[in-house]
Amino acid sequence: MAAAAMAAALRACAAAVARQDAAWRAALAAWAPLLGALGGLAAQMRAARRLAWGGSPLGAFGGLRARLWRKQRGAAEAALEQLGGRRAELRAVRDAVAAAVGAVLRLYEERAAELGLAAALRRGPRCPSLAEALEGLQDVERHYRHLYLESKLLLLRVSCDSLAEMEALPQSWERILERYKPDVVQVRVVLLTRLLRENSVH
């Protein structure tokens, strides 16, 4: 039966999103300290650039400035490499959610005629219609996709040659997160769970 297949697909998708959201949150939690470390390093590197080395006692140590720069740059590159690994984790979640949501949408397209428009639009007193649940799943997929893209673009702009931008990374990241609230995912999953629990798809 189309309705039973649809319910099974929705249930599997909800479980997949819940699993992937936990992985997403774990990856995101690692970003703030790494970006904070990069911001701190950038501040130190800018301060070292401004320092009048020749007119200070440190000027007696001819290679100190270059050694310090290499050490700081190496630390920045190591933090960026770690962030790259975390970004790969975000990409894996994005892809897994896209696959799960895509499977549900394809099934609906295949079985839409059999399900009928009335079934797709029928709502319970406390749960959404199937059409609303499908729209919510697309919102979830879009949330992960857009936030992943923002994280990718943020890291692409980072360079030891642009220390002011690197120093502002923690604030830039916070502004991004403010635009992508995690409750977008939670609310949609709760609504989908209600739909399944109250057997609006049966």
Regions found by a protein language model. Give the residues of each.
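Charged, alpha-helical coiled-coil and adjacent rod-like segments in eukaryotic scaffold subunits
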Residues: 99-202
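Extended, amphipathic alpha-helical coiled-coil scaffold segments used for oligomerization/tethering
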Residues: 4-11, 35-139, 164
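N-terminal alpha-helical scaffolding segments that mark the starts
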Residues: 1-44, 202
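Intrinsically disordered, low-complexity regions enriched in Ser/Pro/Gly/Gln/His and often acidic
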Residues: 17, 24, 62, 164-166, ...
